[in-house]
Amino acid sequence: AEGVEPRGEWQFTPNDPLYLLKDNAANPSKQTKREVLFDKVGIVKELPFKFVNEEGDTIESTVKITSTMAPRELRDPYGPSAMNAGSTDYGTHVRKNIGVSIVRANRELTLSTSFAIDKEKRHRWWGIQVEFSPELDEILGVTNNKQDAENLSSVARRSWDDYQEGNETQVQARKRVRDENYSQFVCIEIAHEVNKQISSIM
């Protein structure tokens, strides 16, 4: 889909942390003329959840996790002087988009750096989006101003390994938490998958 939205004489180009839109704000690079588009990594991961809400209705909802990575030509040095790609105009742009894009109903709540993201400069070259529907608002702790998903953020650096008790296997820990606190289960399941994808990309 084209991302430029015309308003009168102005054109507003969207910020696209995944860098999949041809008309993202960094493309093309004015400095290098390179096409600033990332590649999708693998398939979109779908995490299905089923729960009963406060009204007693059974709700089924799927969280989608999309990962992207800058192709090698964007990460390679540029020009005769072998300028570091991170020092280019688009390198600066992608650095400002380091984080996981949390999207609710097609609108970004926040670009979260709460997940397993350290100061390694290579983090600028990937993008991850977590997309969910409003029926998960309470479970994920969406704030009234729709700027964060606090319950998800609170476990963002966790994995299922952190919840194993005694000699529990990871499978047993998942089942126990799911039975004890389903909201926590959903948040940990998402965080675990996101951090696994970050680790595999890096």
How would you describe each model-predicted region?
Residues 1-3:
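ATP-binding catalytic core of ATPases
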Residues 21, 29-202:
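Charged regulatory segments coupled to nucleotide-binding catalytic modules in large multidomain enzymes
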Residues 5-30:
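N-terminal non-catalytic structural scaffold regions of very large proteins
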